[in-house]
Amino acid sequence: MKILLCVILLLAALLLFAVWPGKRRDELRLPFYGRNYAHRGLFGKDQCPPENSLPAFAAAAQNGYGIELDVQFTSDHRLVVFHDDTLDRMTPGKGFVHDAAWAEFSAMPLAGSDDHPPLFADMLRTVAEANPATPLIVEIKSRHEYTKPYLEDLCRA
């Protein structure tokens, strides 16, 4: 009976240890708490600057916002910042982002402006220059098996 009780107590302690939030995990989350987030950058109803543009990301960082954004791959495996799966709401293009090559995609104006969809790397540089302490929440959109190796490389980077 004592052995059974010891085993139960040991299992309970292990379970508690496994589900108890670690201090390190909480420390990693601290930059994300108590902050407002600019979804797709800081832009107005008139899309000036347009969402997902470098000026919108710079404005969010300069004004102390965290940023939530979406990235996905073009057909030639360039990682771009773009929320929608299709091009037609924010650009004059038609079809899916993953079917467009970077040269075609990057030439499309965002919301009729002079701004164009950015590469993820360019967005990172822009935000780092504006405010390097800006927390980012990045959603990786990928519905295609061919992007798996690129996503694995991205996660390792």
Spell out what each predicted region is.
Residues K2-A157:
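Phosphate-group recognition and catalysis centered on beta-loop-alpha active-site segments
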